[in-house]
């Protein structure tokens, strides 16, 4: 963990020397912000989503507070998020998740930008565990030679700590994991809020606990089209292949899950309101019969930004 923050501090210093802040002092702008969002999730799937896993119905509340300090070419941002999940139904537990983020965006020239980010998650759900704490560092380069085309490449390193949960069994114990993630993204802008986007990702986690090890490759495409000034629709599809190195399928081989999830989103953003709805079908093909399933996930959320 200390190594990640030391690396980020070193890079921040190289990208933005103290003299830059002095030269731009007259143009710095400070902007605090916040967001409150209430949502409802209904799902028939054990599919894992970052921060939320629901097999049934749940009400969610998201609270976000942050502050941004920006000049013409540099932006610092600090942000804190908390999410409450109240799973409906007798005997179903509720929980909360926290996330803290520090970000620096720096324009290098008219075409290039770099992002440096440090992030801390407390008690969130990952592919390999139900109760994970994570500290991560990220470097992202953006190349936008013209407004119609944007390319991004990012690399991050994650350090994870796992607390055992009842689903892990009576012999489970606290363990750690670590590993890289690489993302490549392309977005083609066709007009205002009118985009085609494609994303590729490769990631892995290594751990002394074989049950926590996995590798994953994924790809996604989406198309965003405005229907009027405030309303747009976004169909898309995502495919994910995950191999769990310390788990065995019914065929005696390493457990391998392939998931494909077509979805459609509606986004209505009148003024400072953010009203969003998503319908997703989830199909998982696995050599572990317990994980071989199909399901759906429906989400609607109303948020206000200020």
Regions found by a protein language model. Name each.
Residues 17-19:
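N-terminal signal peptide c-region/cleavage motif recognized by signal peptidases
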Residues 22-306:
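Gram-negative and organellar
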Residues 6-15:
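Bacterial N-terminal signal peptides
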